[in-house]
Amino acid sequence: MFEKKVIFVNTFDNIMIKKNCICIIGGAGHIGAPLGLALSSKGYNVILVDKNTRNIKIINQGQMPFVEEGSAKLLKKMIYKKKIFATNKLDEVKKSKYIIVCIGTPVNKFNPNLKNFINFFYDLRKHLTKN
């Protein structure tokens, strides 16, 4: 489901891992990215994980991949403070205390298509550990 190629990784120092770290799956999208910015601005270390490598690259360059009022300046500030970064490496969830999933579930005639959601959890379980 997620590409194996790593385009950019600017991981947190080991000291910060799990202390107050949140991983947002679907983090480069219209829900995950603004949520990540809000959490990082409140002091959390945020890892945005997404399969959209184009958006990951744009975010890590300090730009938003879509228009979100006031977010461009905040994103640059949070990247400078090393409070947020984006990657396509799903195994980054191991560094987080909390995981938030923001992936799409398209609806077809009033029925959600859960195929991507279910497949994602099969991929995710390989990276989860006890505690």
List each language-model region with its residue ranges.
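Structural/interface elements that position substrates and couple domains in central-metabolism enzymes
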Residues: F2-N131
